Amino acid sequence: MGAVALDHLPEPDRLEVAFAGRSNVGKSSLINALTNQKGLARASGEPGRTRELNFFNVEGGDLRIVDLPGYGYAKAPKPVVEKWTRLTKAFLRGRVNLKRVYLLIDSRHGLKDVDLKIMDVFDEAAVSYQVVLTKTDKIKPPAVKRLIGETGEKIARRPAAFPRVIATSSAKQDGVDQLRAEIVALLPDMG
């Protein structure tokens, strides 16, 4: 289900986790890897393909995944990009059942100024978020380790940031089980 306005959002009847990141960071690919459903979230090589809030109910669970529009570069007119930005900020500030946002960072590029600005939005809205490095198969293991440390240092003083940085590769499935376990740990105990 896609939402282009707040009044199109699904009922807040289950826990939600959202995926945010710059355009082409690998949000859709990671969502597909996490759910083991190749075509669930539409992945594209075209930056700015996701143009609405996309909601995916996870089968057999009390969880909904939200794919947020990419920020930064997008092949869309400026007023359209501004509309996505307003919608995303309003969603983040007002969604009572949003448990955590996973902020995806392309490991080839690391944290950029635009990522720090979105972290400011999360911090101001008191939305818990966790940094997830993507595409780690594209850089050497020592560089991944260094990037995890550098990123951890940069988020250490941020009030809403979860301190653990997760490194993933959707292509090789690296870190996907760890991220899935983090998400499952957020769910209420069903026992």
Swiss-Prot record:
Residues 13-189 form the EngB-type G domain. Mg(2+) binds at residues 28, 50. Transmembrane segments: none annotated. It comes from the Bacteria. PROSITE patterns: G_ENGB (PS51706). The keyword Magnesium applies. GO terms for molecular function: GTP binding; metal ion binding. InterPro entries: G_ENGB_dom (IPR030393), GTP-bd (IPR006073), GTP-bd_ribosome_bio_YsxC (IPR019987), P-loop_NTPase (IPR027417). Pfam families: MMR_HSR1. GO terms for cellular component: cytosol. SUPFAM superfamilies: P-loop containing nucleoside triphosphate hydrolases. Keywords: Cell cycle, Cell division, GTP-binding, Magnesium, Metal-binding, Nucleotide-binding, Septation. Its cofactor is Mg(2+). GTP binds at residues 21-28, 48-52, 67-70, 134-137, 168-170. One of its GO terms (biological process) is division septum assembly. Belongs to the TRAFAC class TrmE-Era-EngA-EngB-Septin-like GTPase superfamily. EngB GTPase family. HAMAP family: GTPase_EngB. Necessary for normal cell division and for the maintenance of normal septation. This is Probable GTP-binding protein EngB. The gene is engB.
